[in-house]
């Protein structure tokens, strides 16, 4: 699981490098750093302002007290003289502290302005990079849509030029094989029906001849018996053509053969009506069949798949049209 997550992370990083999104991520981190820097600079500006205001207030208080002492210098006491000396000595220190606070405030303000300018620059760079990345993704999406449409058109042409004729030829060949198989079965059935009476006719005379020969061999050679035997044999021989009827069967054999030949010729004639798959007539029939009123039986799954494919194709075409007519 850890390897899968690491592989997904590496794949996402590679994809970001290819699309140029890694630079946008770096700019985001830089903007976050600049925001922290600007926040700290503004805090220092606020502290410097407070320190500068405190220094100004301290010096103003000292100068105000010095002025009050100078106004009543004719009534000074020893403590007033000592206080005036201390305030006059600290006035220079207060002035230096005020100047240092002013310089610190100016430096903090300059740093804050630089941080704000750098932040604005980083934001503009990020906006520019995002625009470039968006244009690149839009361009890749447009080319990808064109590529998918080209693949679909190529598959359609391959299916119509190669697969559809092969499937049609296979169907025609299968139909021919089934017709030939049915004709062969019908021939075999007719052959069996023709040979069955002939075999029966050949088996029927054999039994009487065997039966008649037995009494002839066992009989006593008398003139009356010989006459009766000869009459019986002659009547049996005359009855054999009547019992066995091979003549009508031999006449039906050419008729059945002719009917089978007629059936085969009609099947070949119907198959010859189909034009070759690479001809213009075949394309014309195919296009007219697409817009014909022929009833079809389609499953719900095929209908849903057709609707989804149509919706995807329409969305792709509309996206392509919007991408083409959209102003830069």
From Swiss-Prot:
Mitochondrial intermembrane topology ranges: 164-304
Main location: mitochondrion
Topology feature Mitochondrial matrix, residues: 326-328
Known function: Required for the maintenance of the structure of the mitochondrial inner membrane. Involved in mitochondrial morphology. Causes growth arrest when highly overexpressed.
Quaternary data: Homooligomer.
InterPro entries: MDM33_fungi
Any single GO CC term annotated in Swiss-Prot or TrEMBL for this entry: mitochondrial inner membrane
Coiled-coil residue spans: 21-123
Name of the protein described by the UniProt record: Sensitive to high expression protein 9 homolog, mitochondrial
Keyword Coiled coil tagged: yes
Listed Low complexity bias regions: 241-254
Residue span of region Disordered: 225-259
Domain of life: Eukaryota
BP GO terms, sorted: inner mitochondrial membrane organization
Family, as annotated: Belongs to the SHE9 family.
UniProt keywords, alphabetically: Coiled coil, Membrane, Mitochondrion, Mitochondrion inner membrane, Transit peptide, Transmembrane, Transmembrane helix
Subcellular location: Mitochondrion inner membrane
Stretches that traverse the bilayer: 143-163, 305-325
Entry membrane topology: Multi-pass membrane protein
């Amino acid at each position: 699981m850890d390897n899968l997550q690491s592989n997904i992370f590496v794949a996402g990083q590679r994809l970001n490098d290819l699309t140029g999104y890694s630079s946008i991520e770096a700019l985001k981190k830089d903007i976050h750093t600049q925001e922290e820097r600007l926040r700290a600079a503004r805090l220092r500006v606020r502290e410097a302002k407070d320190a500068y205001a405190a220094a100004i207030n301290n010096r103003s208080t000292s100068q105000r007290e010095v002025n009050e002492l100078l106004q009543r210098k004719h009534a000074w006491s020893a403590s007033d003289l000592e206080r005036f000396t201390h305030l006059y000595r600290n006035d220079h220190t207060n002035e230096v502290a005020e100047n240092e606070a002013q310089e610190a405030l100016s430096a903090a303000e300059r740093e804050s302005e630089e941080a704000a300018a750098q932040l604005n620059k980083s934001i503009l760079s990020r906006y520019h990079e995002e625009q470039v990345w968006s244009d690149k993704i839009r361009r890749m999406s447009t080319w990808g849509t064109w590529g998918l449409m080209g693949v679909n058109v190529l598959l359609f042409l391959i299916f119509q030029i190669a697969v559809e004729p092969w499937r049609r030829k296979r169907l025609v060949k299968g139909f021919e094989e089934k017709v030939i198989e049915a004709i062969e079965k019908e021939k075999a059935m007719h052959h069996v029906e023709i040979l069955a009476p002939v075999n029966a006719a050949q088996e029927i005379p054999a039994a009487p001849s065997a039966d008649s020969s037995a009494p002839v061999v066992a009989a006593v050679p008398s003139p009356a018996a010989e006459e009766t035997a000869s009459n019986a044999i002659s009547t049996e021989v005359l009855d054999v053509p009547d019992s066995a009827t091979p003549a009508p069967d031999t006449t039906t054999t050419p008729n059945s053969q002719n009917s089978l030949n007629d059936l085969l010729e009609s099947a070949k004639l119907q198959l010859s009506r189909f034009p070759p798959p690479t001809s213009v007539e075949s394309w014309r029939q195919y296009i007219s069949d697409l817009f014909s009123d022929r009833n079809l039986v389609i499953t719900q799954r095929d209908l849903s798949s057709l609707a989804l494919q149509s919706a995807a194709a329409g969305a792709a075409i509309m996206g392509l049209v919007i991408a083409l007519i959209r102003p830069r």
